[in-house]
Amino acid sequence: MARVYMETMIQKCVSFSQIKQLQSHFLTAGHFQSSFLRSRLLERCAISPFGDLSFAVQIFRYIPKPLTNDWNAIIRGFAGSSHPSLAFSWYRSMLQQSSSSSAICRVDALTCSFTLKACARALCSSAMDQLHCQINRRGLSADSLLCTTLLDAYSKNGDLISAYKLFDEMPVRDVASWNALIAGLVSGNRASEAMELYKRMETEGIRRSEVTVVAALGACSHLGDVKEGENIFHGYSNDNVIVSNAAIDMYSKCGFVDKAYQVFEQFTGKKSVVTWNTMITGFAVHGEAHRALEIFDKLEDNGIKPDDVSYLAALTACRHAGLVEYGLSVFNNMACKGVERNMKHYGCVVDLLSRAGRLREAHDIICSMSMIPDPVLWQSLLGASEIYSDVEMAEIASREIKEMGVNNDGDFVLLSNVYAAQGRWKDVGRVRDDMESKQVKKIPGLSYIEAKGTIHEFYNSDKSHEQWREIYEKIDEIRFKIREDGYVAQTGLVLHDIGEEEKENALCYHSEKLAVAYGLMMMDGADEESPVRVINNLRICGDCHVVFKHISKIYKREIIVRDRVRFHRFKDGSCSCRDFW
């Protein structure tokens, strides 16, 4: 009876002071000798929201010979803490303690599970193989729940080869195993493989869960495959908040922001802050700042407290629309509302000021930050320095980027263009030499387009497509027509020391141009209202931006491009970004 009473008392602890009082009572009443009650108290202290992990460690130090449950409580606490890597340190200490013949603690499935979750959170890939070996050595590989946790940890650490191997070796695969690998493939930018696995799961008769649907919709978002996304979302009720959030995100990222808003409006359950944030972000990246900010302003009226993501979405809307004063007001309001600013908030404001030509203010904000600025902030300043031909600021930003050890090909191009605009050709040559000496590699451009139910991929100068000859002929046709319309190639974007004609040729076979050309081919005779939709893995280049404006006017076809920053809607010779990107 005493044990039941004390366990009830532990469960009733709702503050740290109550936990401390109970611990004192344990010591004086002798309950500390009960391993069951002791481990329950440790768990309450280590993992409850009102507990204190450091105090749990102090309690642990009082134990002369900690048992398995005592160790597990501490490891579990660190796994869910802000320092998950410490869980692996405790695991190694436990492993050392359990190796002696007189040990009374043993690493069990729960120990491994908690440590794996810590490794997944800390992205501690070096520990994964060690844990995998221990699982096999201790005969725990038949534990399907533990194997799924291991699979999830491999996936989150980006080791998809090991994840696939483990998945194929598992004697029993439940829906959680499939979900872990599908989600891992999506986060590892292997969305096509994720969709193949999702379809294989359906073929094998595995009933999908809510988590499956969210992961699959994420894959569709990456691929821009709205048709498959609609098929997956079809049949779900309008009150499932997690799936509806994923559907809003999917529609937005596939370029159908009005359909996203339809899901948002028709949702019958209680909208979470994530629901609102997803919709605000959707409008923001589509350049519909006023609709985004209108929803942002409704948050508190609907009983939702804006969080850091809400403010980031609002700042993103201001950033894409050039709403400088409103953006600064949103940024300054964060402190009044008790919302802590992070690097992304500063990044939005720096980009907003920079693109408005207020480079000194942007520079001052970077220098006054309480945290160390990341390279993205300086890259925003460098990009704006090119727009406004500010050599001094470009050199400052470039120097800061280099000191951080970042060698991005785009940064070299921007600095070179600033020098070229001032006729400083020796400096242009120096930048090129610096780029070559550092062996800077360009990230290959990759674009997707969906045509007749199939996703097609294109790389720069790609000739792997079965219709590449027809696509290149279409490119030649486009080049002829846009030249007649006044197009001049932006050859300054090409850093290589080659002739102007070769530079123009290098520009005309960018992946997004190949995708648009293919889209135009596939839409011959199609409804004029149907746009060409392309997804690009990089920020759209200035030349492609100009070309697509000409194409939209000449071919009377809307072109929608999602790059890594935002959506661009080209129609009748202009872009929704108003050349502010």
Curated annotation (Swiss-Prot):
One of its GO terms (molecular function) is RNA binding. Residues 453-483 are annotated as: Type E(+) motif. Disulfide bonds: none annotated. It holds the Pfam family DYW_deaminase. Keywords: Repeat. The keyword Repeat applies. Residues 484-581 are annotated as: Type DYW motif. The keyword Repeat applies. It comes from the Eukaryota. PPR repeats lie at residues 67-101, 108-142, 143-173, 174-208, 209-239, 240-270, 272-306, 307-341, 342-372. Residues 377-452 are annotated as: Type E motif. One of its GO terms (biological process) is RNA modification. Belongs to the PPR family. PCMP-H subfamily. This is Pentatricopeptide repeat-containing protein At1g34160.
